[in-house]
Amino acid sequence: MISYRKLAMRVLGHSPVSAVKTARRSTGKRAAALALTAALVVGMTLPAFAQDWYIEDGDISISAGENGNNVTQGGTTTENDTDTVIKSKDSSTASSNTVTIDAGEGKTVNVTLDNVTINVDEGSKYGYEPDAYKTAVSVTGSGNTNIELNGNNTLTSGYGHAGLEHNKTDDSGTLTIQDEKNDDGSAKGSASDTTGSLTATGGYHSAGIGGSDGHDGQVTITGGEITATGGNGAAGIGGGAGDTDAVGGDGDVTISGGTITATGGSLGAGIGGGAYGNGTVTVTDGDITAKATGRYGAGIGGGYGAKPKPSGTLIGGNGTVTISGGTITEASGGYMAAGIGSGFQGLGTVTIEGDAVIKNAQGGEAGAGIGSGTYGDSEIIIRGDAVIENAESSANGAGIGSGQGDLYPDGDGMVIDPTVGNVTIEGNAKIENAKSGYGGSGIGGGAVGIGNVIIRGNAQIGNATGGEEGAGIGGGALGTGDVTIEGNVTIENAQGGAGAAGIGGGAETEPDTEDTRNKVSIKSTEAGSPNITAAGGGVLNDENAPLAGAAAIGSGSVADGATEVKSDITIEGKVTINATSGGDVAIGDSTNGETQFSGLQVGTTITRRNAKGDDVSQPGDVVREQAPTETEAAEAPSTGSVEVERPVTVEGLYVTNVLGKQITHTCTQNGTTLTIRANGIVASAHLTLGMVRTLKAQGVKTLVFTTLLSRSTTVSVDALLAAEPDAPDETAVVWTHTGPRAALTIDGADHSDLLK
């Protein structure tokens, strides 16, 4: 058995420019000059002109004006500055002055940071009094702020404040970090383009970019090279640390470009939520590396989630992540958290679609690579042309699915509180490697976790490898699997860990009062036929609780004297399956033995072998082409030679599906019989009488059409030509199968009576 322990956790814890004038000024000009001088003396506002602002000259405050920004520095305000650029005179020396941006409701403030270095970190000299410390750059207000990056910018804030701070409230606007122009202000689009950068470091309990201590954070990034590091309890990009009163901690982050490196503090996500915070992260483009350095925070997603007594209501931890483009180079979760998904105890809701590429998603111990952290369920959809190169849990979490569930003593028995990994993989999605280090499934449930998995469409799975006692696809240790595979799916290797099924249940799963079973459904559809290779886990040589080898498809094994959960397995249509048991039964369970199937379609091949390599195939596992009819046999040449079926090409012939779209077909000829095959339930073969006449001249006497879920139908070439003897060569012949029904038309007229 796997030993699991419960956790006890606590959060510890600009100057006027002078000019020499030689001409005498008019009275009006002298009056204007006097007025200007008076304004400077009493701190009144100046008329607008664009200029650079140097951070060494004092704190800078910016707000939205009527036709630009109102900028205040050193007691002087300039109105309607049309191009606000903040610089450092010497970027190698940090300034302790700050920038505050306040965008009013319905307004937009545009600011450029150009090689600015600010460091206002004073350690903890004032104790726990966040208001006594300073923020390098703070963004507030109900309007929107856009910050353009030129050169290299570095922002380091004090205790309790984010490096670049934007606290999300009910009426706050948005903060967008961008790199739309080159450093010289020119438009991008050439080989000499420059990239602006930002390095932001948050203080204690505060994000690198986003929320301060006790606050939610909102950030949008569209470009630039961004490096963000959160303080203890906070996200690298996203929320500051929240609290058990559900105040703060949430992170709302959108990324549509740039190169991002984000590191969360302990309990915080790399990108997403801080401690006690949820993470909502949307990625449409960019190159991202996100890490949670301590415990309980996801790489991308939720921070630490808690269920404080007496309510037991979950606060934080949830991760809602949508990735529709770009590349996630690495997403690493902390201990008990997912690489992409939720933190400790949270729900991991993850959608990966479009052309997104996940190079490496690494869950911490007991957290999934993609999915949920410990004690959390997951809802995962991977679709479109998304590619997952590697998704892995170091131990007890699924590669893709849920984190570890709970198992604890109760009297003389044990209570099992499983997590649930709901995973759908569809479209043209490709999973190259999904793996658990120990206890969890490759795809499905973590240890003490149920795996509900749907794989369909044209999805491809390379390796799905369970850890010890975890299924390749299905349940983790002590968990059942409910797996549906349908369509043109390829699974190259579903490998169960010791005692667990390749596809199906984890090891040591015993029957419950509701007779819950491992369920596996495999079937072909119009999209095509599944091609699956699965292997059950081998023997577990544990002197305390040894386990026998498990089925390739079906149930995991149990310890001596225990009862194995039964399996319900259905296979329909045309399939190709290579199943190798880790024990005696390849497809099924130890109680009922091998599961037999009937009524499968022509072309089906199921190969079964036990752990010794013996063939344990069953009747109906291999379905060949139907034997020729008596008429076909009589028409065959009596040369005494053996005819061999060979592939042929019929020029102009094509096959469509129910939507009228062309689908793949093959043609083979055996003697005088030509067979057209298509992987479709509703399919139509399109010929012309000219094609049929050519085939007759080539010696073909019988045509056969074979599709999924339909008997093969035949037609005599002579009978077909005799039906419309005077019709021109271009006359259309359409031969349709709709499930078990068949129809034949010539120039739109029904001639189905010719079919046999």
Regions found by a protein language model. Give the residues of each.
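Residue-level detector of functional hotspots within protein domains
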Residues: S26, R30, G660
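A composition-driven surface/loop motif
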Residues: I2-S3, M9, P16, R30-L36, ...
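Long, contiguous ectodomains of secretory-pathway proteins
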Residues: V85-K87, T108-D114, N119-D121, Y128-Y133, ...
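Short, Lys/Arg-rich N-terminal segment immediately upstream of the first membrane anchor
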Residues: S15-T27
